[in-house]
Design a protein with these regions (language model features):
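Non-catalytic cap/lid and distal C-terminal segments of serine-dependent acyl enzymes
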Residues: 1-195
C-alpha cells in the first residue's frame, strides 16, 4: 500500500493524525491515487490552504482474494484484510489517532462499494464514509435503514454525466436525512473518473 503523511509530520513524533483509508476503482490498484489522482499534491495544497485538516491517507489494493477460491473480479476478502491486517499495521507503524472518531473509509467506483460494505459491517470502527462514483449503493442504503450506529457523515460524489448514479445518490441522501445522518452530495463535471 501507499501511505500519505502530512508535510512535517516526522518533526513531532508525539503528534497523532486522523486516518482515511482510500480505495481505488476497477482496473486500478493502489498506485492510481498517487500517479493518476495526484493525491499527495492535492492533500499538500488543501492542507496549506487550510481547506483540509492534516491526516494520514492509506491507499491499499482492493484485490484481496480468498485462498483456495477462484480469483473473481470482485474482491472477496478485502474486509478481512482491512480489519485484521491493514488497520492494525497502520496503527502500530504510523502516528495515527485510534478509534472510530478518527477513522474514515472512502473509495472510487468498486472501492466505494467495498468501503460501504466495510462501514456497514463495522460501524463502531468508522465515523465517515466517502463514495465517489459509487456503483453499488445497497450497503449505503442499509446505513440509513438499519438501527445500528450510523456514520457521522456520508459523502457522495459523481460526474455530471452519471445520471443513474446521481439519482440513486439523491434517493439515498433523502433517506439518510430522514434518519438524521449527515449526507453531502457533490456533482463534478465529467463521467466516471477522478473528478
Amino acid at each position: 500500500c501507499y501511505v500519505y503523511t502530512p508535510y512535517g509530520s516526522q518533526k513531532d513524533p508525539s503528534r497523532r493524525y486522523p486516518v482515511l483509508y482510500l480505495q481505488h476503482g476497477v482496473g486500478e490498484n493502489e498506485t492510481g491515487w498517487i500517479w493518476q489522482g495526484k493525491l499527495n499534491y492535492i492533500m499538500d495544497n488543501l492542507i496549506a490552504e487550510h481547506k483540509c485538516r492534516e491526516m494520514i491517507v492509506v491507499m491499499s489494493c482492493d484485490y484481496a482474494f480468498i485462498e483456495g477460491e477462484e480469483a473473481v473480479f470482485f474482491p472477496g476478502d478485502f474486509d478481512r484484510e482491512l480489519m485484521e491486517d491493514l488497520i492494525p499495521y497502520v496503527e502500530t507503524h504510523f502516528p495515527v489517532k485510534r478509534g472510530r472518531n478518527y477513522r474514515a473509509l472512502a473509495g472510487l467506483s468498486l472501492g466505494s462499494a467495498l468501503a460501504a460494505r466495510s462501514v456497514c459491517r463495522h460501524r463502531d470502527k468508522f465515523s465517515a464514509l466517502g463514495m465517489f462514483s459509487g456503483v453499488s449503493l445497497y450497503d449505503a442504503e442499509r446505513i440509513c435503514t438499519d438501527e445500528a450506529e450510523k456514520p457521522d457523515v456520508v459523502f457522495f460524489s459523481c460526474g455530471s454525466r452519471e445520471e443513474e448514479i446521481s439519482r440513486g445518490i439523491e434517493d439515498i441522501c433523502k433517506k439518510m436525512r430522514e434518519s438524521e445522518t449527515l449526507c453531502v452530495k457533490k456533482v463534478y463535471e465529467g463521467y466516471h473518473e477522478n473528478a
